[in-house]
């Protein structure tokens, strides 16, 4: 039980500790990229003349995570392109209203409901350019629940007629599908109306999206209220036991609903020595293997590094 003085300090202590923890754990966009501001797609992405082949009939859309941009895919995008995929990426969720979001090259800080609508528009652009009714999506961290928001609320999936879905396969990498406890600190948040001021402080420093990914946030309650999945969509959910951002790591896993298939996988079950942290997981050879195997079950490339 907190003493009265401690309870009075909670509105100051809790956001300060959460901000420090989340800031320390999350990995920003690569400072050594040729275009760290996210304005230029990674090699292999956004060839708008690309037409999908019979071997890979769906274009692949890459969706980065919080504080990242499309350069998060500078390893995976050229790998997928080399395998014959049409690959597309974007930088979404730019919002300079927060201290973190005002920094150059930092995206994925805006309200996730607005960012989901950005994803919806981009997917429609890709479908129109490639002449395909559906896309496959690979999403990291925030990108996972963001795409699920797009599918559920912004036209990405049709529960009444799954044949009209715009997404065939969603592959997530360390996604905050059910939120994060920020290594347990999220449980310190008060409930009800007392939570709003604290989340407001977090949003001003780290961005609205950071607050929305804390466990039991209003955004996640709304997203997950109707179940984790959409009929007709295939899901591959990739998790690392060493993840210190999505905590506990298994909260990323999804439960298949009617008409959906879900494959929840641990990186370390395939490659026990894989120690890539949360922000670097899109560069992990193990993750790359899981992604390519999910998109094409016939893929037989190397899995583990070394």
Segments predicted by a language model, with ranges:
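Hydrophobic/aromatic beta-strand patches that form the interior of the parallel beta-sheet core
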Residues: 61, 88, 171, 236-238, ...
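Short aromatic-enriched loop/helix-cap "lid" or pocket-rim segments at secondary-structure transitions
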Residues: 99-102, 179-186, 247-251, 276
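Serine-dependent carboxylesterase/thioesterase catalytic core
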Residues: 64, 87, 105, 115-223
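Extracellular/periplasmic catalytic domains that process cell-envelope and extracellular macromolecules
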Residues: 52-56, 80-82, 129-130, 138-139, ...
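Secretory targeting and sorting signals
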Residues: 1-31
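Solvent-exposed, acidic/flexible segments
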Residues: 56, 66-73, 108-116, 140, ...
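C-terminal catalytic-base region of ester-bond hydrolases, centering on the histidine
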Residues: 192, 228-306
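Active-site catalytic motif of lipid deacylating hydrolases and related acyltransferases
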Residues: 33-39, 46, 53-134, 192
């Amino acid at each position: 039980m907190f003493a009265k003085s401690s309870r009075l300090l909670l509105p100051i202590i809790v956001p300060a500790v959460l901000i420090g923890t989340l800031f320390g754990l999350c990995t920003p966009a690569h400072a050594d990229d040729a275009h760290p501001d996210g304005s230029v797609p990674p090699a292999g992405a956004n060839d708008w003349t690309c037409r999908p082949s019979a071997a890979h009939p769906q274009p692949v859309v890459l969706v980065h995570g919080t504080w990242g941009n499309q350069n998060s895919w500078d390893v995976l995008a050229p790998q997928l392109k080399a395998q014959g995929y049409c690959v597309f990426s974007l930088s979404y969720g730019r919002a300079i209203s927060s201290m973190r979001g005002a920094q150059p090259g930092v995206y994925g800080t805006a309200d996730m409901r607005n960012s989901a609508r950005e994803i919806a528009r981009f997917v429609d652009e890709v479908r129109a350019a490639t002449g395909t009714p559906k896309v496959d999506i690979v999403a990291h961290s925030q990108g996972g629940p963001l795409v699920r928001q797009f599918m559920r609320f912004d036209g990405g999936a049709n529960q009444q007629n799954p044949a009209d879905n715009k997404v065939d396969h969603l592959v997530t990498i360390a996604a905050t599908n059910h939120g994060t406890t920020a290594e347990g600190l999220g449980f310190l948040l008060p409930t009800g109306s007392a939570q709003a001021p604290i989340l407001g402080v977090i949003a001003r420093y780290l961005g609205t999206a950071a607050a929305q990914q804390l466990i039991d946030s209003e955004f996640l309650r709304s997203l997950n209220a109707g179940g984790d999945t959409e009929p007709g969509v295939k899901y591959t959910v990739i998790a690392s036991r060493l993840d210190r951002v999505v905590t506990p790591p298994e909260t990323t896993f999804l439960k298949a609903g009617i008409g959906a298939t879900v494959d929840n996988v641990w990186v370390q079950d395939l490659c026990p020595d894989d120690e890539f942290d949360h922000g670097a997981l899109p560069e992990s050879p193990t993750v790359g293997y899981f992604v390519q195997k999910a998109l094409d079950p016939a893929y037989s490339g190397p899995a583990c590094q070394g």
